[in-house]
């Protein structure tokens, strides 16, 4: 099955503590989760690694979020949108369901 959300897509969070926030997808995991820039920040307690010259401490980083909790952001309508697939010139492309516009 083709992925409706891909890396570098701009998405909006639908549920949870970051509801309504927008960000760019950094990574899509095979477990049905995505990592979004600046969304779902968690504090990780990191041990120092002297061999790599990394200091220890509390590091803030993005955690994965379920792909069902995000929707692709349509800049033309400034709203969350759904994704469809169609064939154009023999290639399968994604499009916004609300206005039919092709996604990059």
Curated annotation (Swiss-Prot):
**Cellular component annotations (GO), alphabetically ordered:** ribonucleoprotein complex; ribosome
Q: Which InterPro entries match?
A: KOW (IPR005824), Rib_uL2_dom2 (IPR014722), Ribosomal_uL24 (IPR003256), Ribosomal_uL24_CS (IPR005825), Ribosomal_uL24_KOW (IPR041988), Translation_prot_SH3-like_sf (IPR008991)
Can you supply a Gene Ontology BP term from the record?
translation
What Gene Ontology molecular function terms does this protein carry?
rRNA binding; structural constituent of ribosome
Q: Which PROSITE patterns match?
A: RIBOSOMAL_L24
Q: Which UniProt keywords apply?
A: Ribonucleoprotein, Ribosomal protein, RNA-binding, rRNA-binding
Query: NCBIfam families given for it?
Result: rplX_bact
- Fill in the subunit field for this protein: Part of the 50S ribosomal subunit.
UniProt-listed HAMAP family: Ribosomal_uL24_B
> Which function does this protein serve?
One of two assembly initiator proteins, it binds directly to the 5'-end of the 23S rRNA, where it nucleates assembly of the 50S subunit. One of the proteins that surrounds the polypeptide exit tunnel on the outside of the subunit.
Q: What's the family? A: Belongs to the universal ribosomal protein uL24 family.
- In Swiss-Prot or TrEMBL terms, this protein is called Large ribosomal subunit protein uL24
Annotated source species? Edwardsiella ictaluri (strain 93-146)
